[in-house]
Structures are given as structure tokens and as C-alpha cells.
């Protein structure tokens, strides 16, 4: 990860969500139809994807698979559903989820973010900004969270547990976040 960050070349590292992977596996096993009721419930309540009709879930799964297949690196949970999803990821390298957590490494990949314009898309916007301001206290003596040229945090839409997001669909929420990302000036998006 660090080498790619330092190279300046575009790349995609992905972290696969467990419920998302189960939904995609269900899609691949059933030809995109007849999603299991528990799959619909989990993808809505645990991942915030809505509505959970076949057309929405099929569109979600197609995008998810395409992203996985185009990723340079995927971090996996090592759950059974992943086997179905990663079959078509011929050029993708895989790692365990923990490998993306920089504080576990003597030479953290995140050190390569020093001096870069960093965009973070996350539901905990305020917390991230507050913690970044205290970065020297978080990991003393380690280069886990260096000083960035700038930090922009886009508030991720969070629709877990069926909570109202103010959007008609997960795709409408995604489009709004994409517009905010497109308006930001950044070198690296997390």
C-alpha cells in the first residue's frame, strides 16, 4: 500500500463489508433474483442500502463486483461469501482486513500520506476532524498519522437500522456524496 501511495499512480484498495459480500454472494448464486429475506434485512439494517427490491440490489451488486474486480488490493473478512465474489478478481491481490490498519505495522502505509491532500468519506466527520487535530497524542513515537497538506472530510450518509437519510434511495445518497467528493481538491481519498 505504501509503495502505491508513494508512486503517485491511481489505484483502488478496497475493504469488503461482510453483509455486502453476503448480498453479492446471494446475487451470484441466485442469478440476481430471489434475494433471501435475511439478506434484504441485513443489507438494509447493517449496511444501509435501500430500498431492497431486486432491481436496487442487482444494481448494487453489479457495482460492488465491478469495484472488486478493478481493485489492486482487497482486504477480506475471510467469510465464506467472499469466495463467490472474488472468483472474477483475477488481477486483484488480497490481504486480511487487519493489514489496512496502519498502527499494526512498523512502517505504516499511512506515513505516505504526509504532505498530501487527503479526503476522507466517513459518517464520523466531527470525530475524525477532532482526532486529527490531536494526532500527535494518538500514536506517540509512530508515524501512523502524519501531517497532511490538507484534510477534507465528507459526511457519509448513514442509513443503518432503517433510519431516514433524506434520500429516496441508497443510490441517490451515493450520488450526493460523489458530488461532494468531486468538488473537493485531494490527492488521496479514504
Regions found by a protein language model. Give the residues of each.
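Electropositive, gly/pro-rich neighborhoods at or near active sites that engage anionic ligands
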Residues: 1-150
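A mid-sequence, solvent-exposed acidic-amphipathic segment
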Residues: 147-188
Amino acid at each position: 500500500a505504501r509503495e502505491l501511495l508513494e508512486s503517485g499512480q491511481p489505484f483502488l484498495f478496497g475493504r469488503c463489508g461482510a453483509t455486502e459480500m453476503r448480498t453479492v454472494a446471494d446475487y451470484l448464486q441466485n442469478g440476481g433474483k430471489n434475494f433471501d429475506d435475511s439478506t434484504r434485512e441485513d443489507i438494509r439494517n447493517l449496511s444501509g442500502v435501500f430500498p431492497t427490491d431486486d432491481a436496487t440490489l442487482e444494481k448494487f451488486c453489479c457495482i460492488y463486483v465491478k469495484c472488486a474486480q478493478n481493485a489492486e488490493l482487497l482486504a477480506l473478512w475471510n467469510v465464506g461469501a467472499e469466495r463467490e465474489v472474488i472468483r472474477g478478481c483475477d488481477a486483484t491481490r488480497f490481504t486480511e482486513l487487519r493489514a489496512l490498519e496502519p498502527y499494526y505495522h512498523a512502517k505504516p502505509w499511512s506515513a505516505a500520506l504526509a504532505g498530501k491532500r487527503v479526503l476522507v468519506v466517513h459518517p464520523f466527520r466531527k470525530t475524525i476532524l477532532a482526532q486529527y487535530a490531536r494526532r500527535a497524542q494518538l500514536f506517540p513515537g509512530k508515524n501512523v498519522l502524519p501531517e497532511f497538506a490538507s484534510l477534507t472530510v465528507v459526511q457519509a450518509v448513514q442509513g443503518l437500522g432503517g433510519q431516514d437519510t433524506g434520500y429516496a434511495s441508497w443510490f441517490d445518497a451515493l450520488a450526493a456524496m460523489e458530488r461532494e467528493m468531486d468538488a473537493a481538491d485531494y490527492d488521496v481519498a479514504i
